[in-house]
């Protein structure tokens, strides 16, 4: 019997190059998602998110191009509670400043969609995406579209009765961004390094790494709560809050559990101590990776992860002490993305060996010629 491949990329050189090309494209997309999260942080911190009051996925790509168009957009903004209660008297030039960040945030999201979709179609047509990988990539594209809808769902919450967006919807929007970013990295790493070298004590370190990533995710969600209800301004000292570890005003709302989600003092308290616990778990993971004699790459990633963890804690404290200075707060969100990426990389290096397959990840499954009938 002989094998016959349906893939145009079946030649040895193209089949070897295809995974790398697809992986590089996915890493570019992950980098764009990273930049998107940074732009989103600036948009939120400058209170620019409600400056565009309509959702026009196609025609909204262009900003106002004439004075009349600017005045029309400004008039729409003047109808919402944020302007009427908090920004009354804002000039047109000031409005243009906040409009820029929200417009850039939305434009960058559109660009990510284009940069993902067009190469995806190109790789697929050329046979460089396997049947196993195609649904994963299609799912990532759909997640990106869902993220755009979630963004508008979040903005909508601040256009009628509120002067800001729902912090629950903000957390959903931020969490989805981190999920897409982590998924892009995971798939890219799987293509670049489909069979990482076995690591000593990987079976013990893997649950530890998953626990660290889960804790980081919960800490990020509470960070979004802190941002959404301006809890970062409640107490700007460290480690005490108003001279005590746990201020009494943490428990002023009923039912009691609601304080953990909506009370500014309690939300900041939870984020602070979740961050401490997460940092300790991550640093413990890094120490264990070194102590068990992991390979050079695992040790290198663990060292970077430890350094990034210490830096992130420092950025969080500095953000508090600076009363949420925008450059520091933006860097703090970037630090969370770096930690996420390094933990995804760590988990990739710790993953169990896979059963060998007959087909390579990015080539079509070979067909077997049927014997001619006698």
UniProtKB/Swiss-Prot annotation:
Pathway(s) this gene product operates in, as recorded in its UniProt entry: Porphyrin-containing compound metabolism; heme A biosynthesis; heme A from heme O: step 1/1
GO biological processes: heme A biosynthetic process
Cofactor: heme b
Keywords: Cell membrane, Heme biosynthesis, Iron, Membrane, Metal-binding, Oxidoreductase, Transmembrane, Transmembrane helix
Localization: Cell membrane
EC number(s) reported in the record: 1.17.99.9
InterPro entries reported in the protein's UniProt record: COX15/CtaA_fam, HemeA_Synthase_type2
Top EC category: oxidoreductase
One cellular component (GO) term of this entry: plasma membrane
Top-level taxon of origin: Bacteria
GO MF terms, alphabetically ordered: metal ion binding; oxidoreductase activity, acting on NAD(P)H, heme protein as acceptor
HAMAP family: HemeA_synth_type2
PANTHER family: CYTOCHROME C OXIDASE ASSEMBLY PROTEIN COX15 (PTHR23289), CYTOCHROME C OXIDASE ASSEMBLY PROTEIN COX15 HOMOLOG (PTHR23289:SF2)
Role description: Catalyzes the conversion of heme O to heme A by two successive hydroxylations of the methyl group at C8. The first hydroxylation forms heme I, the second hydroxylation results in an unstable dihydroxymethyl group, which spontaneously dehydrates, resulting in the formyl group of heme A.
Subunit structure as annotated in this protein's UniProt entry: Interacts with CtaB.
Name recorded for this polypeptide: Heme A synthase
Lineage: Bacteria, Pseudomonadati, Pseudomonadota, Alphaproteobacteria, Rhodospirillales
UniProt gene name: ctaA
């Amino acid at each position: 019997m002989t094998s016959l491949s349906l893939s145009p990329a079946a030649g040895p050189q193209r089949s070897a190059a295809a995974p790398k090309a697809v992986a590089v494209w996915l890493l570019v997309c992950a980098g764009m998602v990273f930049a998107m999260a940074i732009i989103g942080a600036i948009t939120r911190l400058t209170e620019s998110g409600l400056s565009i009051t309509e959702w026009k996925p196609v025609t909204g790509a262009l900003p106002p191009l004439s004075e009349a168009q600017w005045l029309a957009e400004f008039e729409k903004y003047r109808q919402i509670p944020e302007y009427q209660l908090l920004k009354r008297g804002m000039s047109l030039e000031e409005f243009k400043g906040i409009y820029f960040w929200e417009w850039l945030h939305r434009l960058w999201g559109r660009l990510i969609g284009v940069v993902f979709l067009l190469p995806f179609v190109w790789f697929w047509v050329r046979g460089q995406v396997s049947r196993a990988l195609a649904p994963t990539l299609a799912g990532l594209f759909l997640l990106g579209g869902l993220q755009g809808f979630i963004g508008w769902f979040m903005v909508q919450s601040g256009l009628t009765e509120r002067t800001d967006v729902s912090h629950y919807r903000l957390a959903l929007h931020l969490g989805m961004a981190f999920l897409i970013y982590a998924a892009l990295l995971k798939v890219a790493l799987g293509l670049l390094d489909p069979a990482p070298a076995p690591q000593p004590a990987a079976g013990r370190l893997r649950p530890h790494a998953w626990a660290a990533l889960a804790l980081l995710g919960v800490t990020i969600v509470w960070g979004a709560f802190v941002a959404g209800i301006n809890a970062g301004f409640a107490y700007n000292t460290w480690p005490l809050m108003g001279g005590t570890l746990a201020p009494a005003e943490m428990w002023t709302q009923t039912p009691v559990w609601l304080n953990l989600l909506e009370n500014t003092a309690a939300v900041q308290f939870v984020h602070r101590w979740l961050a401490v616990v997460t940092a300790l778990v991550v640093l413990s993971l890094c120490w264990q990776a070194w102590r068990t004699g992991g390979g050079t790459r695992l040790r290198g990633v663990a060292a970077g992860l430890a350094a990034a963890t210490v830096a992130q804690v420092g950025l969080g404290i500095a953000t508090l002490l600076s009363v949420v200075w925008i450059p520091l707060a933006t860097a703090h969100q970037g630090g969370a993305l770096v930690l996420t990426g390094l933990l995804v990389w760590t988990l990739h290096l710790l993953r169990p060996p896979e059963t060998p397959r007959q087909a390579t990840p990015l080539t079509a499954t070979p067909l077997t010629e049927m014997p001619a009938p006698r």
